[in-house]
UniProtKB/Swiss-Prot annotation:
It comes from the Bacteria. This is Bifunctional protein FolD. PANTHER family: C-1-TETRAHYDROFOLATE SYNTHASE, CYTOPLASMIC (PTHR48099:SF5), C-1-TETRAHYDROFOLATE SYNTHASE, CYTOPLASMIC-RELATED (PTHR48099). Disruption phenotype: Probably essential, it was not disrupted in a global transposon mutagenesis study. NADP(+) binds at G149, L150, G151, V215. Its EC number is 1.5.1.5, 3.5.4.9. Pathway: One-carbon metabolism; tetrahydrofolate interconversion. Pfam families: THF_DHG_CYH, THF_DHG_CYH_C. SUPFAM superfamilies: Aminoacid dehydrogenase-like, N-terminal domain, NAD(P)-binding Rossmann-fold domains. The keyword NADP applies. The keyword Secreted does not apply. The gene is folD.
Length: 273
């Protein structure tokens, strides 16, 4: 079974219109020339507009230095009109993404990627998985789970969440010798490698649950997931298409986290008066 993630996420997003977003502002910093990022950013800006939050995109050239970008982030940290900051990944090769992420004030970390992010803020991909799990009553207990790919915005936070939650989970990366053997026996598989249609239906067992997290463009410049959809309907019990599967729920998580930060900062301001 697959589903229209965009439609379901949109229906949940509509409920956020009831909140007062007049003093909420999201700033997205883009320091890359990545086509996929353009698509992701567009969806985030549309979501902000839908609920009534302000948003701004700061697009930087490849001439930006590490020091200049950190200075820009610090300036946004101190801007009382900015509620949340997103550093859109990836960044230009000459930039150190980890140092840049750590420069973001945890009180403005919408993505939940800083080391000291607020306890209430989950990484957006994790929040998306939790929402889907609850929405479709997916059972993770006593299931063999495999996460393929350990990127900072995909597989890594998913693996850490599953592990700390006590689920039976294994992680695979490019150095894992028996990845295909592991996923063939898995009940639930998360793919997050960003390689167009790398996995085929034959790689999974009958009745598997599949979360296709990775996004890339094929030779025709079309957005694709890690899993080739051909034959998947007959193999998987439940799966997410890409695009339109997990992605809309990560955007929904951004809006949820932005509101949490707004409320947190409002309480901090009130307590200081």
């Amino acid at each position: 079974m697959s589903f229209d993630g965009k439609l379901k996420a949109q229906s949940i997003l509509e409920t956020y219109k009831n909140f007062d977003w007049s003093k909420c502002k999201l700033v997205i910093i883009q320091a890359n020339d990545d086509d996929s990022s353009d698509s992701f950013i567009k969806q985030k800006l549309i979501a902000c507009n839908t609920v009534g939050a302000k948003s701004e995109l700061i697009k930087l050239s490849n001439q930006i230095t590490q020091a200049e970008l950190i200075e820009k982030i610090i300036s946004l940290n101190h801007d009382v009109n900015v509620t949340g900051i997103i550093l859109q990944l990836p960044v230009y090769p000459h930039l150190d993404k980890n140092s840049l992420l750590e420069a973001i004030n945890p009180l403005k970390d919408v993505d939940g990627l800083t080391t000291n992010h607020l306890a209430e803020i989950k990484p957006c991909i994790v929040e998306a998985i939790i929402t889907l799990k609850e929405l479709f009553n997916l059972e993770f207990n006593n299931q063999k789970i495999v996460v393929v790919g350990l990127g900072i915005t995909g597989g890594k936070p998913i693996y850490e969440f599953l592990k700390t939650s006590g689920y039976k989970v294994q992680a695979c990366d490019k150095d894992t010798p028996n990845t295909f053997e592991l996923i063939k026996s898995a009940d639930i598989v998360f793919t997050a490698i960003g390689k167009s249609h790398f996995f085929q239906a034959k790689n999974f067992k009958k009745g598997v649950i599949l979360f296709d997290i990775g996004v890339s463009r094929n030779k025709q410049n079309k957005l694709c997931g890690d899993i080739n959809p051909e034959g998947i309907e007959k193999k998987a019990r439940w799966w997410t298409k890409t695009p339109g599967g997990v992605g809309p729920f990560t955007v929904l998580a951004i809006i949820k986290n932005l509101w949490i930060l707004h409320e947190k900062n409002k309480r901090c301001l009130q307590s200081s008066i």
